[in-house]
Amino acid sequence: MIDDRKLQILRAIIQDYISTGEPVGSRTIAKKYNLGVSSATIRNEMADLEDMGFLEQPHTSAGRIPSSRGYRLYVDRMIEFERLSSEEEGLIRNSIIDGTLYEVDKIIKQTSALLSELTKMTCIVKAPSVHKSFVKSIQLLKVDDVSILCVLVTDNGVIRNTVIKVKSVPISEELIKISKIITERLKNLTIEQINLEVISNLNRALSGYEDIVNAVLPALYESLKGDETSEVFLEGTINIFNYPEYNNIHKAKEILELLHDKKSISELISDSDDMTVKIGDEIFVPEAKECSIISAGYHVGDKSLGTIALIGPRRINYSKVLSIMTEVMKELNETLKNK
């Protein structure tokens, strides 16, 4: 059980360390924070906090820094969300593009760029898993006498355009009819569910247009059948190097290799719809043990689409970053309601 005085001292140490990046000593806390106790008392309390696992002592310093457990207690029990400036609020409102006009992946990329800019952190997006999505509609449009533009829309708003080659492109009225039949037969199916029986039935329904069916289906497959890890992308990768924690060439190389390993990055991110904060030892990827990751899901209605996360060192301004993340995700999910 940690008493109120220890909580006050721990909060002061964490806030000071977040601000300065320098290990904190008892004299610093006594001078800068009006806690009503002496430097000697603070020193004794800091020793207790270290014994309890809330503080650590760097090898080269007499001061203390928060441990992962200390940051966890701070986030869970002591944090106060920072009020955003009117400029920041305006930027959030005006930067997320209209959900009625753009497909989901463009909206998400715009949002990730906004988060990266506002927080000065690296933003990770686990995008909609398109090969697990359902077909919503397929539209065929004439490009020239032997080329058709195949426009696929999935249930989570992802749009894929592919040009296919055929012997001869039918007239527009016929293409509309073919598009309607293909959509009716494939709607609400995933790529894995489009089996030989489905293909056979589709060929029977479109007798005489088998060359179009046989060109459309492989195009759909190639559009949707992607490696799961390819659906992770980053924004603001270099932002991680704004923090002195990564001035060390070994740590910089390690974090860069992690950020370029999409499989590991995907494993880092919680699939929870709720906002989640993972700190240090709570992260099971070894290269991220000194990081913090804040993530939240985005969705259309009741359907979860993906996750957006921010990664940085443990020493981030949690009150500011969580405020920004909360407002941005609220605005994003409101925008996606229109999809």
From Swiss-Prot:
Gene3D superfamilies: 3.30.450.40, Heat-inducible transcription repressor hrca homolog, domain 3 (3.30.390.60), Winged helix-like DNA-binding domain superfamily/Winged helix DNA-binding domain (1.10.10.10). Keywords: Repressor, Stress response, Transcription, Transcription regulation. InterPro entries: GAF-like_dom_sf, HrcA, HrcA_C, WH-like_DNA-bd_sf, WH_DNA-bd_sf, WHTH_transcript_rep_HrcA_IDD. GO terms for molecular function: DNA binding. One of its GO terms (biological process) is negative regulation of DNA-templated transcription. Pfam families: HrcA. It comes from the Bacteria. Negative regulator of class I heat shock genes (grpE-dnaK-dnaJ and groELS operons). Prevents heat-shock induction of these operons. Belongs to the HrcA family. HAMAP family: HrcA. This is Heat-inducible transcription repressor HrcA. It comes from Clostridium perfringens (strain 13 / Type A). The lineage of its organism: Bacteria, Bacillati, Bacillota, Clostridia, Eubacteriales. The gene is hrcA.
